[in-house]
């Protein structure tokens, strides 16, 4: 467990799970083996997040750009998602974990969409941890869909353009009702957001770790939380102002 105080635990942690393919390549294995080992890292991280009192854990599972990958790899990823939900949903429900899905569901195959909806519906009343799965997700697409929704309301007279605020835009995003991420972790040593939670990351702390996702374990997660606790979050203010506000 992290050695930080409860007040230093982030409410919302988001993770870009990167490096499955490179993990497999290093070991002379097919890429799908990296993805399979990555599922084990997901299970371990979800348990760790629940154990240390995090309220929201968002995992970037499949981006809207991932459809460009070889058809065989996409098929493997879809199969792993279905297997994860079928195998783990009952346990997540028993552990009081709520599942939410963000991303564009239009165009998904019926069986995938039905499984995602089943996971949300079964766990809707759970309160310990909200596990947010970003699937067929791209932040630019999310923002485009949100602003198009607002534009339609303005065009049809339901909304004044003068009434548009950052809070309104946030309410139209897939993450509506969720706090912005306090901490965004990316594995594999890459240092970029890759079209993930661009709007929501305005004041997030970032941690880029060298481990490939299949090697990211419980202790590495706790270490990330401890590193977060050392950060000085100012939200655009001076350090002195933050200190006074927290006094």
Swiss-Prot record:
PROSITE patterns: UPP_SYNTHASE. Its cofactor is Mg(2+). One of its GO terms (biological process) is polyprenol biosynthetic process. Transmembrane segments: none annotated. It comes from the Bacteria. Binds 2 magnesium ions per subunit. Gene3D superfamilies: Decaprenyl diphosphate synthase-like. Its EC number is 2.5.1.-. One of its GO terms (cellular component) is cytosol. Substrate binds at residues 19-23, 31, 35, 63-65, 67, 69, 186, 192-194. CDD domains: Cis_IPPS (cd00475). It is an enzyme of class 2 (transferase). Keywords: Magnesium, Metal-binding, Transferase. GO terms for molecular function: ditrans,polycis-undecaprenyl-diphosphate synthase [(2E,6E)-farnesyl-diphosphate specific] activity; magnesium ion binding. Mg(2+) binds at residues 18, 205. The active site is at residues 18, 66. Catalyzes the condensation of isopentenyl diphosphate (IPP) with allylic pyrophosphates generating different type of terpenoids. NCBIfam families: PRK14830.1 (NF011405), PRK14834.1 (NF011408), uppS (TIGR00055). Belongs to the UPP synthase family. Homodimer. This is Isoprenyl transferase. It comes from Agrobacterium fabrum (strain C58 / ATCC 33970) (Agrobacterium tumefaciens (strain C58)). The gene is uppS.
């Amino acid at each position: 467990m992290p050695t930080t105080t409860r007040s230093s635990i982030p409410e919302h942690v988001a993770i870009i799970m990167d490096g499955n393919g490179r993990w497999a390549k290093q070991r002379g294995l097919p890429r799908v083996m990296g993805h399979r080992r990555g599922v084990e890292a997901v299970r371990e991280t979800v348990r760790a997040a629940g154990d240390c009192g995090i309220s929201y854990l968002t995992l970037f599972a499949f981006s809207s750009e991932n459809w460009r990958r070889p058809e065989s790899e996409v098929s493997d990823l879809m199969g792993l998602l279905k297997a994860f939900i079928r195998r783990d949903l009952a346990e997540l429900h028993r552990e009081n974990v709520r599942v939410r899905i963000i991303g564009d569901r239009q165009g998904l195959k019926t069986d995938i969409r039905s499984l995602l909806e089943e996971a949300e519906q079964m766990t809707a009343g759970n309160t310990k941890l909200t596990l947010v799965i970003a699937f067929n997700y791209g932040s630019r697409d999310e923002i485009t869909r949100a602003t198009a929704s607002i534009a339609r309301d303005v065009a049809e007279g339901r909304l004044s353009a003068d009434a548009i605020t950052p809070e309104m835009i946030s309410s139209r995003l897939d993450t509506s009702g969720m706090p912005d991420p306090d901490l965004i972790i990316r594995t594999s040593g890459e240092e970029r957001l890759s079209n993930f939670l661009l709007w929501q990351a305005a004041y997030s702390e970032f941690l880029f770790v060298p481990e490939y996702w299949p090697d990211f374990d419980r202790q590495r997660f706790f270490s990330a939380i401890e590193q977060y606790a050392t950060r000085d979050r100012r939200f655009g203010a001076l350090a002195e102002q933050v200190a006074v506000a927290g006094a």
